[in-house]
């Protein structure tokens, strides 16, 4: 089993109407990747698509993928444009991961050393930090 230390939130930095198929095509044909960029991707309506299981390594943050799980919302081209449904879906994904990996740190792609990106266009740790309390309450009770 992989040692998970980071739960990383991303944006696709694309328009909201971008399809998952076109994102996958970009990874494969445009970037030459053999695996996907994220474990889960969230459409504007909040639909969560699983692209890889937790035991698989994806291409989310260079140098940190072996110990990270990655979730992305479609959007975030120039600003944080998450829909309410995407905000809620991200929280649900992170909560389910925290229940399995309670010591993992929630962070954004931009929070890693040497990353020169705004992704995910907001402070993920600040926004979703309350989930740590939820997990701790569940584990203690």
Q: Where are the language model's segments positioned?
A:
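Generic detector of short alpha-helix boundary/capping microenvironments
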Residues: 28, 34, 59-60, 78, ...
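Basic/polar, cationic surfaces and motifs that engage anionic cell-wall
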Residues: 1-12, 44-48, 67, 74-141
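Short, conserved "active-site rim" segments that organize catalytic pockets and cofactor/ligand binding
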Residues: 1-55
């Amino acid at each position: 089993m992989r040692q998970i230390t980071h739960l990383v939130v991303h944006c696709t930095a694309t328009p909201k109407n971008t399809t998952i198929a076109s994102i996958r095509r970009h990874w494969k044909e445009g970037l030459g990747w053999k695996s996907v960029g994220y474990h889960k991707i969230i459409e504007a309506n909040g639909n969560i698509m699983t692209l890889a299981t937790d035991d698989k390594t994806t291409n989310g943050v260079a140098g940190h993928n072996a110990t990270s799980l990655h979730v992305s919302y479609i959007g975030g081209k120039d600003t944080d444009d998450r829909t309410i449904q995407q905000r809620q879906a991200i929280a649900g994904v992170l909560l389910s991961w925290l229940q399995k990996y309670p010591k993992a740190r929630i962070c954004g792609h931009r929070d890693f050393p040497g990353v020169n990106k705004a992704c995910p266009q907001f402070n993920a740790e600040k926004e979703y930090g309350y989930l740590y309390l939820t997990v701790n309450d569940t584990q203690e009770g």
